[in-house]
Amino acid sequence: MTRRDTTRVIRPATGPERTCKSWLTEAALRMLMNNLHPDVAERPEELVVYGGIGRAARDWESYDKIVETLRRLEDDETLLVQSGKPVGVFRTHADAPRVLIANSNLVPRWASWEHFNELDRKGLAMYGQMTAGSWIYIGAQGIVQGTYETFVEMGRQHYGGDLSGRWLLTAGLGGMGGAQPLAAVMAGAACLAIECQPSSIEMRLRTGYLDRSTDKVEEALAWIEESCAAKTPISVGLLGNAAELLPELFKRGVRPDLLTDQTSAHDPVNGYLPAGWSLERWHAMRDQDPPQVAEAAKASMAAHVKAMLDFQAAGVPTVDYGNNIRQMALEEGVTNAFDFPGFVPAYIRPLFCRGVGPFRWAALSGDPEDIAKTDAKVKELIPDNPHLHNWLDMAGQKIRFQGLPARICWVGLGDRHRLGLAFNEMVAKGELKAPIVIGRDHLDSGSVASPNRETEAMRDGSDAVSDWPLLNALLNTASGATWVSLHHGGGVGMGFSQHAGMVIVCDGTEAAAKRVARVLWNDPATGVMRHADAGYDIALACAREKGLDLPGIL
């Protein structure tokens, strides 16, 4: 089992020529490779895409076998992938998914990091995060609009909708957290982001998500102060450890206008540097003594959360951004760790009630012009949404593509299928140079059960009910998605979430149009269904408006 290979540089093919037998399998191959593009993946030599140890394949041998199998897969066959390893090819039919993926799923009683890490060391499992192991990660852009929407809503609730002259304090500049600086600036706020790994800061600078960086606290604060005074937002990366710096900043009397965190606290062994430790010690001890690392990391998380609670008590709007750091602190004795809310119940749930979530697409041509054309098509089909148009304009100006050109765009039930059908027609007419892949984050309205994040504080108390993502995956499979994934532990770590993903390919054919119409209606409709079942009035109204048949609910 080879987990590290520094000799490989993976980039997807581009253009109209295929190496697979159909565009459906070619799309899966290109998106798998795109996840490992050096401008996309955090540690591509280790197959790690983002989120601590979120991988695209279990090991390099498995990666090679997946590539080989996709290239020979027939139009009526389906590849099964078990925790990043290809395990079977079976005859199905043309409208069935070409790939079905299950990553890091464990029987609940055994669903702990300790048991998973034991399996991982034996080569029996792989952590897929959300979009790492499901081959639809598009770099930091994949989370940037959701982060932007959250910051805009924070500004609306706390500052009358105006974040100019204000600033956000946060930590974590990995594959997810790396979206924060750009999202804050796009929302009108300056951002100071603490990050312990120089490589993560360098990647955000290189890809345009961060404006400048320093390892000096005074310099960072001076830049933020100047930015706020001029009402010209900038983003600053500060090299350091959040567990050390947040308490220090509070003691100094520093008071940001907004506070959150996106360190990889979900994984106490691989994701969070203990206070007082060097990177070298951390990397060595992760292999030598994982329990000691976890113990030290969780103690540091407790200090981190205590500082966040101090800021909140001082009047700073504070929110958990879904990395499970509150749970880790609670287990370390911080009994009031959940006094600050998660971002979904605080700011995002009304969108989920209408099936609105992180719709994304990528241009298999590799040509940015194809994304520009699809952006224009979105505006044409949804003409009466100035907020969405503003987002697309900003994205076109400020977001640099990582790997294959792609776009994230939060839309919901009734719009997703219209956009998909329009993209498919553009491919059919030759307006786009190659097919389009449409997917989404597993963080969506009907595809996840995560009591400390997406399903926190559900109205009916159904936070931990995970039937919903299972039903979502089953329905997407029956509807004809090109590949479907079912994962455990993404975002918040082992034992705390189950979630499903889907991808559909627009190859310009009539058969694709039928699949697109089914999948991109049914997928967001499950989100409306899930929230209607929980008793949310917005979801119930949406279900009635869209004519959903929900016999046990309506």
UniProtKB/Swiss-Prot annotation:
Residues annotated for NAD(+) binding in this entry: 51-52, 129, 175-177, 195, 241-242, 262-266, 272-273, 321, 491
Principal place of residence: cytoplasm
Protein known as: Urocanate hydratase
GO cellular component: cytoplasm
Family: Belongs to the urocanase family.
EC code: 4.2.1.49
Cofactor note: Binds 1 NAD(+) per subunit.
Superkingdom in the source lineage: Bacteria
Top class in the EC scheme: lyase
UniProt source species: Caulobacter vibrioides (strain NA1000 / CB15N) (Caulobacter crescentus)
Job description of the protein: Catalyzes the conversion of urocanate to 4-imidazolone-5-propionate.
Biological process (GO), any one: L-histidine catabolic process to glutamate and formate
Compartments, as annotated in UniProt: Cytoplasm
